[in-house]
């Protein structure tokens, strides 16, 4: 079995944090996002991985080759962004082999080994309040998918596609995507993976819907921090600090410096960062960043950033009111 991971996204909604790195290279809980995805792939028993790269793809390639060289890796480059179906096609081969497809900017709460143990094709689904923003699966009483629709205006189901797919024979999916492109069948101007899977269903290929506990799309600051909380919760806390108060879960790099501060919960402090006289909760601090005399929550601090304020000495009497901007 092999895996295909689309990771060519620019991450416009995460700017300025994606001006210098691709979205999948943002640091969460002590590891780049693509690293967490590859850990999931390995837990499913995958040994061969195609990572579809684009924007600043050389950074992805360098990181993955450094830390995951034990896997068989290749990095197809998506020159033109023509949709998820087109991206996935770049990583498929003409071999009778199962393929696990995971979106490179998504964190999943699922048993991956159990997911790929299905005896048929499978897609991960999650119940959502507003399915119109997602690909949607309609299913029968046996959880067999009867229809897939990309971002329907009037959804007939509340089961959203979560961005994880297992196809028993990659050649079948490859043929479906190639037909979309040959016939120029687009939805919202792109070749959609959802439409290729629907073609498979229409051609008699069974696909099961597997409801998972949850998934975290890292496309916005808010969803990125949600993913961060989930990852810290499911990993052992790593603390390296003296003279500070730590509220787990946190990740503090062994080469970070934290002094006279309160850290956590849900904080990552990357290599070389220095935190002095600060209170941090729900925050990600990048490599070599400096934070001094600050109270931060729900914050993203980039690599080499400097965030500081001044200490103040005040003398405030009874019934007084002091407001500091």
Regions found by a protein language model. Name each.
Residues 2-5, 13, 27, 31-102, ...:
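Conserved N-terminal catalytic core of the sugar/cofactor nucleotidyltransferase
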Residues 180-325:
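Left-handed beta-helix
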Residues 10, 105-106:
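Active-site metal-binding loops of divalent metal-dependent hydrolases
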Residues 24, 72-74, 144, 206-208:
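Conserved beta-strand segments of alpha/beta enzyme cores
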Residues 108-180:
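Conserved core of the sugar-phosphate nucleotidyltransferase
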Residues 11-16, 132:
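Short N-terminal binding/cap micro-motifs at the start of the first secondary-structure element
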Residues 25, 137-139, 209:
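A structural signal for short hydrophobic beta-strand segments in well-ordered beta-sheet cores
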Residues 50-54, 125, 284, 300:
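Short internal beta-strands
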